[in-house]
Curated annotation (Swiss-Prot):
Protein name: 3-hydroxyacyl-[acyl-carrier-protein] dehydratase FabZ
GO cellular component, one term: membrane
SUPFAM superfamilies: Thioesterase/thiol ester dehydrase-isomerase
Active-site residues, record numbering mapped to chain: H48
EC primary class: lyase
GO MF assignments: (3R)-hydroxyacyl-[acyl-carrier-protein] dehydratase activity
Domain of life: Bacteria
Keyword Cell membrane: no
UniProt EC number: 4.2.1.59
Species, as recorded: Chloroflexus aggregans (strain MD-66 / DSM 9485)
Length: 144
Protein backbone atom coordinates (compact mmCIF):
# COMPACT_ATOMS: atom_id res chain seq x y z
CA UNK A 1 0.00 0.00 0.00
CA UNK A 2 1.25 3.50 -0.85
CA UNK A 3 0.15 6.59 1.05
CA UNK A 4 -0.61 9.93 -0.57
CA UNK A 5 2.92 11.09 0.32
CA UNK A 6 4.46 8.08 -1.42
CA UNK A 7 2.27 8.68 -4.47
CA UNK A 8 3.41 12.33 -4.58
CA UNK A 9 7.03 11.14 -4.47
CA UNK A 10 6.41 9.25 -7.75
CA UNK A 11 4.09 11.53 -9.76
CA UNK A 12 4.12 15.34 -9.99
CA UNK A 13 0.37 15.94 -9.60
CA UNK A 14 -0.82 18.04 -6.66
CA UNK A 15 -4.13 19.34 -5.32
CA UNK A 16 -6.55 19.95 -6.91
CA UNK A 17 -5.34 17.65 -9.70
CA UNK A 18 -4.00 14.71 -7.68
CA UNK A 19 -6.85 12.23 -8.14
CA UNK A 20 -5.52 9.11 -6.37
CA UNK A 21 -5.70 8.98 -2.58
CA UNK A 22 -3.88 5.70 -2.03
CA UNK A 23 -2.48 2.69 -3.83
CA UNK A 24 -3.77 -0.54 -2.32
CA UNK A 25 -1.98 -3.00 -4.63
CA UNK A 26 1.22 -2.54 -6.61
CA UNK A 27 3.30 -4.75 -8.88
CA UNK A 28 5.98 -2.33 -10.18
CA UNK A 29 5.83 -2.01 -13.94
CA UNK A 30 2.92 -4.45 -14.16
CA UNK A 31 -0.16 -3.37 -12.24
CA UNK A 32 -1.54 -0.90 -9.73
CA UNK A 33 -4.84 -0.59 -7.90
CA UNK A 34 -5.69 2.77 -6.39
CA UNK A 35 -8.58 4.42 -4.64
CA UNK A 36 -10.13 7.86 -4.86
CA UNK A 37 -12.50 8.83 -2.07
CA UNK A 38 -14.88 11.15 -3.89
CA UNK A 39 -15.72 14.08 -1.61
CA UNK A 40 -18.53 16.61 -1.93
CA UNK A 41 -15.78 19.23 -1.52
CA UNK A 42 -14.13 18.46 -4.87
CA UNK A 43 -13.82 21.78 -6.73
CA UNK A 44 -15.31 20.42 -9.97
CA UNK A 45 -18.65 19.71 -8.28
CA UNK A 46 -19.33 23.46 -8.10
CA UNK A 47 -20.08 23.43 -11.82
CA UNK A 48 -20.64 19.74 -12.71
CA UNK A 49 -23.53 19.88 -11.91
CA UNK A 50 -25.00 22.22 -9.26
CA UNK A 51 -27.62 20.28 -7.32
CA UNK A 52 -26.71 17.03 -9.11
CA UNK A 53 -22.95 16.47 -8.62
CA UNK A 54 -21.37 13.95 -11.01
CA UNK A 55 -17.61 13.37 -11.34
CA UNK A 56 -16.57 14.30 -14.91
CA UNK A 57 -15.64 11.28 -17.00
CA UNK A 58 -12.40 12.88 -18.14
CA UNK A 59 -11.32 13.11 -14.49
CA UNK A 60 -12.07 9.41 -13.98
CA UNK A 61 -9.76 8.75 -16.95
CA UNK A 62 -7.14 11.06 -15.42
CA UNK A 63 -7.37 9.18 -12.10
CA UNK A 64 -6.80 5.93 -13.99
CA UNK A 65 -3.84 7.47 -15.83
CA UNK A 66 -2.30 8.61 -12.55
CA UNK A 67 -2.71 5.08 -11.16
CA UNK A 68 -0.98 3.68 -14.25
CA UNK A 69 1.78 6.26 -13.88
CA UNK A 70 2.44 5.00 -10.35
CA UNK A 71 2.81 1.45 -11.71
CA UNK A 72 5.22 2.59 -14.44
CA UNK A 73 7.25 4.99 -12.29
CA UNK A 74 7.68 2.46 -9.48
CA UNK A 75 10.27 0.70 -11.66
CA UNK A 76 13.81 1.73 -10.67
CA UNK A 77 14.76 2.49 -14.30
CA UNK A 78 11.93 5.05 -14.48
CA UNK A 79 12.86 6.93 -11.30
CA UNK A 80 12.64 10.68 -11.84
CA UNK A 81 10.80 10.32 -15.17
CA UNK A 82 7.44 11.76 -16.20
CA UNK A 83 4.52 9.78 -17.63
CA UNK A 84 2.39 11.58 -20.23
CA UNK A 85 -0.84 10.58 -21.94
CA UNK A 86 -0.25 9.44 -25.53
CA UNK A 87 -3.80 8.31 -26.23
CA UNK A 88 -7.06 6.88 -24.98
CA UNK A 89 -8.88 4.16 -26.92
CA UNK A 90 -12.25 2.57 -26.34
CA UNK A 91 -13.25 4.71 -23.36
CA UNK A 92 -16.69 3.77 -22.08
CA UNK A 93 -18.61 5.18 -19.13
CA UNK A 94 -21.11 2.83 -17.52
CA UNK A 95 -22.07 4.43 -14.19
CA UNK A 96 -22.03 7.90 -12.70
CA UNK A 97 -19.66 8.66 -9.84
CA UNK A 98 -20.99 10.88 -7.06
CA UNK A 99 -19.81 12.38 -3.77
CA UNK A 100 -19.44 9.66 -1.15
CA UNK A 101 -18.37 7.02 -3.67
CA UNK A 102 -15.05 5.20 -3.41
CA UNK A 103 -13.63 4.91 -6.90
CA UNK A 104 -11.45 1.80 -7.33
CA UNK A 105 -8.87 2.35 -10.07
CA UNK A 106 -7.25 -0.71 -11.67
CA UNK A 107 -4.58 -0.47 -14.36
CA UNK A 108 -2.78 -3.42 -15.93
CA UNK A 109 0.25 -2.41 -18.01
CA UNK A 110 0.47 -4.67 -21.04
CA UNK A 111 3.37 -3.47 -23.06
CA UNK A 112 6.31 -1.10 -22.85
CA UNK A 113 8.67 -0.44 -25.76
CA UNK A 114 11.09 2.44 -26.19
CA UNK A 115 9.30 4.57 -23.64
CA UNK A 116 5.80 4.00 -25.04
CA UNK A 117 3.35 1.86 -23.09
CA UNK A 118 -0.18 0.55 -23.18
CA UNK A 119 -2.47 -0.43 -20.33
CA UNK A 120 -5.99 -1.68 -19.68
CA UNK A 121 -7.85 0.45 -17.16
CA UNK A 122 -11.07 -0.05 -15.19
CA UNK A 123 -12.75 2.13 -12.60
CA UNK A 124 -15.44 0.65 -10.37
CA UNK A 125 -17.69 1.76 -7.54
CA UNK A 126 -18.98 -0.97 -5.21
CA UNK A 127 -17.93 -3.60 -7.80
CA UNK A 128 -19.98 -1.85 -10.52
CA UNK A 129 -18.09 -0.78 -13.64
CA UNK A 130 -17.95 3.01 -13.96
CA UNK A 131 -15.37 3.37 -16.73
CA UNK A 132 -13.03 1.29 -18.86
CA UNK A 133 -10.44 2.28 -21.44
CA UNK A 134 -7.15 1.42 -23.06
CA UNK A 135 -4.53 3.99 -22.09
CA UNK A 136 -1.44 4.80 -24.14
CA UNK A 137 1.39 6.62 -22.42
CA UNK A 138 4.93 7.86 -22.85
CA UNK A 139 7.66 7.76 -20.21
CA UNK A 140 9.92 10.75 -20.73
CA UNK A 141 12.52 12.98 -19.15
CA UNK A 142 10.64 15.79 -17.36
CA UNK A 143 13.01 18.44 -18.71
CA UNK A 144 12.27 17.65 -22.38
Amino acid sequence: MLSIQEIMALIPHRYPFLLVDRIVELEPGVRAVGEKLVSANEPYFQGHFPGNPIMPGVLILEALAQTGAVAALSLPEHAGKLVLFAGIDGARFKRVVRPGDTLRLEVQLERMRRGIGKGQARATVADQLACEAELLFAVTDPTK
